[in-house]
């Protein structure tokens, strides 16, 4: 599954953050795609060339499969599961660009520089149904995108084409569709951070056992609707972040409330579904932050510290084991 959200800091930095929740061990790494790098789409074999360099979390499978990333123009994107709702074209349409679902992040970050650019270019995009060999299934995906304006988009593939929504909450999870999640928020308008006052009932003076009574009814389970509501609530009432570092910390703190520990969710196939990594990327600085399940220390790679005109993709080896800062 997965949860994603965006934040704006007081100094106008914009971050896109996500959890990667999955049962299959993805084995992802941070990878840089340089400018003018050619890759061939599995849809039609056509060669594509990157206009913009980008960095993100991915895995090499012939082409590199990216789950999320940020490019040099400040456009960021994350792919999340959309089971039961994602529908793709069965055949190639003439006079359009053809890609398969798991190539969308690569395509959009390599040729688009803003959300307006995305809106324009997807008019001539066809996403063709094709299995990802690694999982032997067609990945049902939808995508959240952000840029330096602070605006956000959600793109969902449906039977009648690609649906593009301005994502005002700046939150996305999984199925149902985005409009359903936004409508569902109306059920939670009474939830608030402020403690409720003591009250007299039946001749008794009643007061809360402790803080948090205003959040009674805030869903705490791991289903997509509950995670969506929880993320919107936490983002809405978050103490403003002064700068990028504070914003990144805040994003990790919010997503910690959606993180799934091993054993808490078991699939129908008796597989452990858990949060494999959490990442946060800043649209202005090109910083890509992340931590893995087995190492909670935040690690960082900066896009602009690299040669963006290098000839081949570059893989960054992350420390997998827990890193503990010892004080004595």
UniProtKB/Swiss-Prot annotation:
The active site is at 2 (nucleophile). Stable at 40 degrees Celsius but steadily loses activity at higher temperatures. Rapidly inactivated at 60 degrees Celsius. Its EC number is 3.5.1.11. Transmembrane segments: none annotated. Optimum pH is 6.6-7.4. Functionally stable in the pH range 5-12 but loses activity at acidic pH. GO terms for biological process: response to antibiotic. Penicillin acylase activity is enhanced in the presence of the reducing agent DTT, indicating active sulfhydryl group in the enzyme. Activity is inhibited by the chelating agent EDTA in a concentration-dependent manner. Inhibited by cephalosporins and conjugated bile salts, substrates of the closely related bile acid hydrolases. Progressively loses activity with increasing concentrations of the denaturant guanidine hydrochloride. Signal peptide: none annotated. The catalytic N-terminal nucleophile is exposed by a simple removal of N-formyl-methionine, unlike L.sphaericus penicillin V acylase, which undergoes a post-translational autocatalytic cleavage. It catalyses: a penicillin + H2O = 6-aminopenicillanate + a carboxylate. PANTHER family: CHOLOYLGLYCINE HYDROLASE (PTHR35527), HYDROLASE (PTHR35527:SF2). This is Penicillin V acylase.
């Amino acid at each position: 599954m997965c949860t994603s959200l965006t934040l704006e800091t007081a100094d106008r930095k914009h971050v896109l953050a996500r959890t990667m929740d999955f049962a299959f061990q993805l084995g992802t790494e941070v990878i840089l795609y340089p400018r003018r790098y050619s890759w061939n789409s599995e849809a039609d074999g056509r060669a594509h060339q990157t206009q913009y360099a980008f960095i993100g979390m991915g895995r090499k499978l012939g082409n590199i499969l990216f789950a999320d990333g940020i490019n040099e123009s400040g456009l960021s994107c994350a792919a999340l599961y959309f089971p039961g709702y994602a529908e793709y074209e069965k055949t190639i349409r003439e006079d359009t660009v053809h890609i398969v679902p798991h190539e969308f992040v690569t395509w959009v970050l390599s040729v688009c520089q803003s959300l307006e650019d995305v809106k324009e270019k997807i008019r001539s995009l066809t996403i063709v149904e094709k299995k990802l060999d690694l999982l032997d299934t067609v990945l049902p995906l939808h995508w959240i995108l952000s840029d330096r304006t602070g605006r956000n988009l959600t793109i969902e593939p449906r039977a009648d084409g690609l649906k593009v929504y301005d994502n005002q909450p700046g939150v996305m999870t999984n199925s149902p569709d985005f409009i359903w999640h936004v409508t569902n928020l109306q059920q939670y308008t009474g939830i608030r951070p402020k403690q409720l006052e003591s009250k007299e009932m039946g001749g008794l003076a009643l007061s809360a056992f402790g803080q948090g009574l205003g959040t009674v009814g805030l869903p705490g389970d791991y289903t997509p609707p509950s995670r969506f509501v929880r993320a919107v609530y936490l983002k809405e009432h978050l103490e403003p972040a002064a700068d990028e570092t504070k914003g990144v910390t805040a994003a990790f703190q919010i997503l910690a409330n959606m993180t799934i520990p091993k054993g808490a969710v078991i699939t129908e196939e008796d597989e452990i579904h858990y949060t494999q990594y959490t990442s946060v990327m800043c649209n202005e600085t090109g910083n890509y932050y992340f931590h893995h399940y087995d190492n909670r220390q935040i690690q960082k790679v900066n896009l602009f510290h690299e040669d963006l005109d290098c000839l081949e993709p570059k893989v960054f080896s992350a420390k997998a084991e827990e890193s503990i800062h010892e004080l004595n």
